[in-house]
Structures are given as C-alpha cells and as structure tokens.
C-alpha cells in the first residue's frame, strides 16, 4: 500500500502571471508527486468551477488562496491514509467531499491538483514513467500535434475573430520529425510576417498575432510558410481551426468583425465549407457556439464526413453532456481538458466514451499553462492520437513537447506515430 501521509497546496503563477494551484503529495515511502493546474481564457459556461478568491486587493481578484486552503485542510483530512494507487477511489472521495455537480465548493482547481499529484506520486512509487502508469504496456502511440501558430480572438489583441489557426504535421514519420516540421514552419512564418512589416509578437499560446485584413489572409500566410519551409500543404502538413465561436456569437448571429459579416448558422457553415474546399483544413474546433446545438447539427451534417468537428466548449470534458451530443449526432471529436472536469478518473472516462462512439479525443492544454507536462503523458497513456499544446515558442508549451520527445525516446522502436490515421473519425 502506498499510503498518503502528507499533502501541501500552494499558490503559484501560470504563464500569464495569474495565480494557479500547485499540490505536493507525499507517500509513506518518502515518494513525492507534484502537479500544477492550468487555466483557460475562453471557457465553456458548463465547465467545472475554478475557485478564485475574488479579493480585488490581491492579483485583481484572481488569487487562489481559498482553493489552497481547501487542499491543506478539508481535502487533506479526507485523503490522508488513502492508497495513492487507488486513483478512482481517491477521485470519488474528492467528488463526494465537494458534493456539488460543478465542483464549485472545493474548486475544480484544488481537486485536480490533488488528483494529478497523487497519480504522479503513485507512478513514482511504482517505478513507472507516468504514461506507462496510465496506460500499461499498450501505451505506444504518440500523438499528432495541433500547433497553434496564429492566435486571434481571446488569445490575442488583433482583428481576428477565430481564436486559433493550427498546423498539423500528419505526414511526418515520427513525433520527433513532426515537431521539426512544426518548428521550421513556425520560423518560416515569422520571417514572412516580419518581411510584410507586421508584428511578430506572440499570443498566450505562443502563436503570432498579425493584424491581417481577413481570416483567409491568415490561412494564406500559413500556407506560404509551409511552402517556404519546404513542405507540401495537405500531404505533409494540414490546417486546423479553433473558431471558439461562442466568443463572437451574439443575438443568434455569428459576428465576424474582420469581414464585417453577421451570419446565421447556415451561412456560417457555408463559409466554413468554402474554406474547407479551398484550403487543406482537416479539423474545426468549436465551429458553433456552445448553446447553438441546431447550428452544430448543421455543421456536422455538412462537414462531418470530411473534417474533424471538435467539441470543446460544447462538451467541456463532461460525459453527461458528451453522451447527449453523441446521441444527437453532433460533432465527431471531443477536446479533452483536464481542468474542465476536475479529476483524472472523469477525464479518462470521457476519453474512453469517445473511443467507444468512434469519436476522436484531442488532449489539450489551456491558454494559462505551467511547466507541468502531465497532459503529454495522458496523450500517450490513453493512446489518444492527438494533442493540442500550443505553438513552437514559450517554455510552458515546450514543456509538453519536450516530454513527448522523451517518451518517444523511451518507447524506442515500439513508438508509433499515427499521422493521418489519428483522424479515424473521417471517411
């Protein structure tokens, strides 16, 4: 038995300079696990609640001392003596202790920090790397990265309404090479943007934030960079979009300020379909607003055979909401964000539900990140096949990519990079 003998929560800062929660868990053997939780900018309204202090005299009200106090008192009392290797029981203990549907009493940030730290301690105790602890000997598949090289929306201060324009190196032979493809395109894009006299400043997730006239111009810049780096768009590198459409959905219309357009769901779907026909787009995330389920059905029926349609704000890593979407034939993929739900056990259940339904699961970071690289191990440990963890700059993003390099090295010859096969939801 790997009994938990001590637990310590603390307030640290994330990649945006905002407070977040870190937790240390000590086992009776002396083994320690540490984890830090991320935080989002564009958040779904049905996400588990991230507990903030609301004290405007500290960190503009964003302090997390209440969440930390919950770890150091109530949660500590409940989990001391529990077996760290019994993750499901530990997470159920946390859920029952909180007693709410959305983890608003203890805070999902407090609960997730404990859940992750316990898993890290248990993996260390067992002598296994974290990905192997999660997935056993079957964990051999590396994820295809979705790299956010142009930022807009809530992640940037520019004219773009769409939040992320991503490159997806699905033609690479390995994860290591996929990372190289992405880095070389990133640097080619930087030169192109610079030569056009635009700013090469980066957004929250490390992508560039150029002030372009339209969304298509942003796509064309990326295609130019792919070509300049010596790669073939569509074959070696595809494009993905995260529209984060809830952010520009107002009064029943999709308001595209960059184009000066106000579109209903059918018109917005037509516009996305035009882009899909014109450009090598293979994935569209949050193409409709989280509450526009009719719009989601229109989008899925129109493009769901040829493009990965990812629900993020739509499903918020919640199996109850996700099941409703599956039953209604909405989307064909789910974005997995551990802090949207608040425990590892619930996260894994959502990934498993996706696989059973023939949906893909994309493991994702948040815009406010830390040096914690747990999601890299989750991506491999669950054989998810895809990961979304930012651009090719900022050390908070590189922490995940570099961990994946280590995992691929550790796997050696049995490491498998799925490439286009990761999009098994497409026909």
UniProtKB/Swiss-Prot annotation:
<dbReference type="GO" id="GO:0006096">
    <property type="term" value="P:glycolytic process"/>
</dbReference>
<dbReference type="InterPro" id="IPR029017">
    <property type="entry name" value="Enolase-like_N"/>
</dbReference>
<feature type="binding site">
    <location>
        <position position="242"/>
    </location>
    <ligand>
        <name>Mg(2+)</name>
    </ligand>
</feature>
<keyword id="KW-0963">Cytoplasm</keyword>
<feature type="active site" description="Proton donor">
    <location>
        <position position="205"/>
    </location>
</feature>
<dbReference type="Pfam" id="PF03952">
    <property type="entry name" value="Enolase_N"/>
</dbReference>
<keyword id="KW-0324">Glycolysis</keyword>
<feature type="binding site">
    <location>
        <position position="337"/>
    </location>
    <ligand>
        <name>(2R)-2-phosphoglycerate</name>
    </ligand>
</feature>
<keyword id="KW-0964">Secreted</keyword>
<comment type="pathway">
    <text>Carbohydrate degradation; glycolysis; pyruvate from D-glyceraldehyde 3-phosphate: step 4/5.</text>
</comment>
<dbReference type="GO" id="GO:0005576">
    <property type="term" value="C:extracellular region"/>
</dbReference>
<keyword id="KW-0456">Lyase</keyword>
<protein>
    <recommendedName>
        <fullName>Enolase</fullName>
        <ecNumber>4.2.1.11</ecNumber>
    </recommendedName>
</protein>
<comment type="function">
    <text>Catalyzes the reversible conversion of 2-phosphoglycerate (2-PG) into phosphoenolpyruvate (PEP). It is essential for the degradation of carbohydrates via glycolysis.</text>
</comment>
<feature type="binding site">
    <location>
        <position position="367"/>
    </location>
    <ligand>
        <name>(2R)-2-phosphoglycerate</name>
    </ligand>
</feature>
<feature type="active site" description="Proton acceptor">
    <location>
        <position position="337"/>
    </location>
</feature>
<dbReference type="Pfam" id="PF00113">
    <property type="entry name" value="Enolase_C"/>
</dbReference>
<dbReference type="GO" id="GO:0009986">
    <property type="term" value="C:cell surface"/>
</dbReference>
<keyword id="KW-0479">Metal-binding</keyword>
<feature type="binding site">
    <location>
        <position position="163"/>
    </location>
    <ligand>
        <name>(2R)-2-phosphoglycerate</name>
    </ligand>
</feature>
<comment type="similarity">
    <text>Belongs to the enolase family.</text>
</comment>
<dbReference type="InterPro" id="IPR036849">
    <property type="entry name" value="Enolase-like_C_sf"/>
</dbReference>
<dbReference type="GO" id="GO:0004634">
    <property type="term" value="F:phosphopyruvate hydratase activity"/>
</dbReference>
<feature type="binding site">
    <location>
        <position position="285"/>
    </location>
    <ligand>
        <name>Mg(2+)</name>
    </ligand>
</feature>
<dbReference type="InterPro" id="IPR000941">
    <property type="entry name" value="Enolase"/>
</dbReference>
<dbReference type="InterPro" id="IPR020810">
    <property type="entry name" value="Enolase_C"/>
</dbReference>
<feature type="binding site">
    <location>
        <position position="312"/>
    </location>
    <ligand>
        <name>Mg(2+)</name>
    </ligand>
</feature>
<feature type="binding site">
    <location>
        <position position="388"/>
    </location>
    <ligand>
        <name>(2R)-2-phosphoglycerate</name>
    </ligand>
</feature>
<feature type="binding site">
    <location>
        <position position="366"/>
    </location>
    <ligand>
        <name>(2R)-2-phosphoglycerate</name>
    </ligand>
</feature>
<dbReference type="GO" id="GO:0000287">
    <property type="term" value="F:magnesium ion binding"/>
</dbReference>
<dbReference type="GO" id="GO:0000015">
    <property type="term" value="C:phosphopyruvate hydratase complex"/>
</dbReference>
<dbReference type="InterPro" id="IPR020809">
    <property type="entry name" value="Enolase_CS"/>
</dbReference>
<keyword id="KW-0460">Magnesium</keyword>
<dbReference type="InterPro" id="IPR020811">
    <property type="entry name" value="Enolase_N"/>
</dbReference>
């Amino acid at each position: 038995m790997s009994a938990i003998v001590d637990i310590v929560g603390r307030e640290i800062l994330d990649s945006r300079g905002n407070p977040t929660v870190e937790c240390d868990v000590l086992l009776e053997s002396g083994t320690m696990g540490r984890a830090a939780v991320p935080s989002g900018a564009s958040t779904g309204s049905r996400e588990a609640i991230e507990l903030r202090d609301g004290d405007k005299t500290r960190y503009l009200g964003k302090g997390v001392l209440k969440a930390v106090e919950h770890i150091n008192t109530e949660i500590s009392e409940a989990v001391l003596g529990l077996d760290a290797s019994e993750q499901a029981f530990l997470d159920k203990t946390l859920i029952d202790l909180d007693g709410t549907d959305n983890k608003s009493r203890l805070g999902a940030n407090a609960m997730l920090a404990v859940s992750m730290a316990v898993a890290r301690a248990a993996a260390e105790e067992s002598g296994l790397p974290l990905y192997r602890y999660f997935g056993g000997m079957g964990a051999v598949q590396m994820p295809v990265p979705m790299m956010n090289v142009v930022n807009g929306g809530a992640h940037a201060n520019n004219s773009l309404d769409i939040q992320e324009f991503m490159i997806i190196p699905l033609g690479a032979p390995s994860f290591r090479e996929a990372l190289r493809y992405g880095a070389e395109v990133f640097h080619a894009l930087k030169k192109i943007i610079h030569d056009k006299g635009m700013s090469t400043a980066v957004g929250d997730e490390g992508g560039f934030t150029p002030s372009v006239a339209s969304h298509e111009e942003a796509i064309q810049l990326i295609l130019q960079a792919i070509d300049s780096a010596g790669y073939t768009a569509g074959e070696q590198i595809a494009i993905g979009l995260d529209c984060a459409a809830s952010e520009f959905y107002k009064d029943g219309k999709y308001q595209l300020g960059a184009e000066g357009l106000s579109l209903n769901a059918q018109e917005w779907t037509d516009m996305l379909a035009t882009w899909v026909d014109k450009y090598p787009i293979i994935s569209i995330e949050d193409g409709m607003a989280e509450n526009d389920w009719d719009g989601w059905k229109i989008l899925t029926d129109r493009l769901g055979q040829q493009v990965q349609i990812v629900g993020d704000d739509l499903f918020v890593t919640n199996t109850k909401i996700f099941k409703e979407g599956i039953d209604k034939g909405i989307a064909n993929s789910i974005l997995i964000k551990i802090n949207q739900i608040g425990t590892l056990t619930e996260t894994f259940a959502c990934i498993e539900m996706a696989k059973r339904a023939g949906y893909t699961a994309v493991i994702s970071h948040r815009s406010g990140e830390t040096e914690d690289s747990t999601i890299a191990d989750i991506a491999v440990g669950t054989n998810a096949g895809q990961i979304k963890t930012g651009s090719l700059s900022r050390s908070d993003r590189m922490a995940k990519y570099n961990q994946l390099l280590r995992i691929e090295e550790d796997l050696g010859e049995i490491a498998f990079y799925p490439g286009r096969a990761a999009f098994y939801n497409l026909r």
